[in-house]
From Swiss-Prot:
The enzyme's E.C. designation: 5.6.1.7
Pfam family, one: Cpn60_TCP1
Gene: groEL
GO cellular component terms attached to this protein's record: cytoplasm
Main EC class the enzyme belongs to: isomerase
UniProt protein name: Chaperonin GroEL
SUPFAM superfamilies linked: GroEL apical domain-like (SSF52029), GroEL equatorial domain-like (SSF48592)
Entry's localization field: Cytoplasm
Calcium as UniProt keyword: no
Quaternary structure and partners: Forms a cylinder of 14 subunits composed of two heptameric rings stacked back-to-back. Interacts with the co-chaperonin GroES.
Binding-site list for ATP: 29-32, 86-90, 413, 478-480, 494
Reaction catalysis annotation: ATP + H2O + a folded polypeptide = ADP + phosphate + an unfolded polypeptide
Superkingdom field: Bacteria
Entry-linked Gene3D superfamilies: GroEL, GroEL-like equatorial domain, TCP-1-like chaperonin intermediate domain
Length: 543
């Protein structure tokens, strides 16, 4: 296919238009008075959301060059979401601010490479400043405040704080639909491990890219499965029962995996395969944990067992299993309660006896998975559209809370980013030329989130930013109540990890955009260039 090329100013300005179109859509959602965005769906009712990454992923622009700019900003949002689980709108606002100001300077003749160095130095200094002002999460109230701000809902904050209290800060929390209109938290015994599905064709929910199995059998083995004949009798028994199957194995290779995938696609049976968690002796121990939890048996050479001889009685089972590309969560296993309690006691004894800190940590992880259970947040709403929107908010709040537990929290509402600006003065003083310009660009961009929060509240952003700079550190603008106050004392806080990731990812992609000198895109095909359908020949003998 023929390509279309743009260079220098033409290339950058086309991409900037795409950046602006996406960012202008996303930034309307930031802050307590941010608005929602309605997304058209190819089927079903439209989605109403204020989730930055969901909006960014749904935007596809007609102009190829503009679309590339938009997709780079979308990548910033996605990367921030992957790392911190929240802060995608902040990342988008920061990216637009850095790119817009940077483009002006590059157009005026500044060297983009020098500007890039300045952006990188300023970002590193700002991140250090954020870490220094960070507070540790100590109480249930801290967790509730962080979740409340992320979801813009105090009830959600309380729910998540309750869930984390029940299963611990490192516990597993999942989100499900409720049958009613109320949202509640239930704790169900369960286990999660960091292995996902072997093939994306095994997913059952294409929106979330996850596989959900209801009341499945669980085959647990430390063997490699390369020949489908080894498990064929077992598969036939499972099909006759009409139930789904989760296979946990050392690996599935050869023709076995494609055969499973093909039968899954055809609808012959519902199967998901995952690799066994851990390595060596720890793998064997974790497989035993899963077997005890599900009431199954580990099919292992150590026990002199062969896969082809395995029966359906040796399979475990569970009420529900959820598998993503990175993790598997088994909820409400069918294992014997006494056997589970006995296994928990064994692990507790091992923790007491071990002298290795590493071994102790791994044993405590196993104990939490076996005894801690899984907290299930059941989300209720009056309509399907409201349910989707509510789930997005709860997912963001949950991710933000986990991020805060890891790295602490800073004053919210964009206050921390403005407070960290003086930390860049020392770096700026030692820089010259275009590098100093890059640092100034970041200093200006750090004001952008507060500015946008104020504008979404119907105020003049510059006035709020200037007043904020006069206040002592930690005092910020509370857009919900339209007043300046101590943000931490008011419970308006952001996870340090979220704020840090948003800034780092925004700076990284912005620097790449500014140093772009040429853009190559597919040339649009003219409408009349579509190939004509061939006319059938050899029909002359027909009457």
């Amino acid at each position: 296919m023929a390509k279309e090329l743009k260079f220098s100013e033409d290339a950058r300005s086309a991409m900037l238009r795409g950046v602006d179109k996406l960012a202008d859509t996303v930034k309307t959602t930031i802050g307590p008075k941010g608005r929602n965005v309605v997304l058209e769906q190819s089927y079903g009712s439209p989605t109403i959301t204020n989730d930055g990454v969901t909006i960014a992923k749904s935007i596809e622009l007609e102009d190829h060059f503009e679309n590339m700019g938009a997709k780079l900003v979308s990548e910033v949002a996605s990367k921030t979401n992957d790392i911190a689980g929240d802060g995608t709108t902040t990342a988008t606002v920061l990216t637009q601010a850095i790119v817009t100001e940077g483009m002006k300077n590059v157009t005026a003749g500044a060297n983009p490479v020098g500007i890039r160095r300045g952006i990188e130095k300023a970002t590193a200094a700002a991140v250090e400043g954020l870490k220094k002002m960070s507070h540790d999460v100590k109480t249930k109230d801290d967790i509730a405040q962080i979740a409340s701000i992320s979801a813009a809902n105090k009830e959600v904050g309380k729910l998540i704080a309750d869930a984390m209290e029940k299963v611990g800060n490192d516990g597993v929390i999942t989100i499900e639909d409720s049958r009613g209109v109320d949202t509640s938290v239930d704790v169900v015994e369960g286990m999660s491990f960091d292995r996902g599905y072997m093939s994306q064709y095994m997913v059952t929910d294409n929106d979330k890219m996850e596989a959900n199995l209801d009341n499945p059998y669980v085959l647990i083995t430390d063997k490699k499965i390369s020949n489908i004949q080894d498990i064929l009798p077992l598969l036939q028994s499972v099909v006759q029962e009409g139930r789904a199957l989760l296979i946990i194995a050392d690996d599935i290779t050869g023709e076995a995996l494609p055969t499973l995938v093909l039968n899954k696609i055809r609808g012959t049976f519902n199967v998901v395969a995952v690799k066994a968690p851990g390595f060596g002796d720890r793998r064997k121990a974790q497989l035993e944990d899963i077997a005890v939890l599900t009431g199954g048996t580990v099919i292992s050479d150590d026990l002199g067992m062969q896969l082809k001889d395995a029966t359906i009685d040796q399979l475990g089972s569970a009420n529900k299993v959820t598998i993503t590309k990175d993790a598997t969560t088994i909820v409400d296993g069918s294992g014997n309660k006494e056997a589970i309690a006995e296994r928990v006691d064994q692990i507790k004894k091992a923790i007491a006896e071990t002298t290795s800190d590493f071994d102790k940590e791994k044993l405590q992880e196993r104990l939490a998975k076996l005894a801690g259970g899984v907290a299930v947040v059941k989300v209720g709403a009056a309509t399907e559209t409201e349910l989707k929107e509510k789930k997005y908010r709860i997912e963001d709040a949950l991710n933000a809370t986990r991020a805060a537990v890891q790295e602490g929290f800073v004053p919210g509402g964009g206050t921390a980013l403005v407070n960290v600006i003086p930390a860049l003065d020392e770096v700026e003083a030692s820089a010259t030329g275009d590098e100093a310009t890059g640092i100034k660009i970041v200093k200006a961009a750090l004001e952008a989130p507060v500015r946008q929060i104020a504008e979404n509240a119907g105020l003049e952003g510059s006035v709020i930013v200037n007043q904020l700079k006069q206040e002592k550190p930690g005092v910020g603008y509370n857009a919900a109540d339209d007043k300046f106050e101590d943000m931490v004392a008011a419970g308006i806080v952001d996870p340090t990890k979220v704020t840090r990731s948003a800034l780092q990812n925004a700076a990284s992609v912005s620097a790449l955009l500014l140093t772009t000198e040429a853009v190559v895109a597919d040339k649009p095909q003219p409408a009349d260039a579509a190939p004509q359908a061939p006319v059938a020949g050899g029909m002359g003998g027909m009457m």
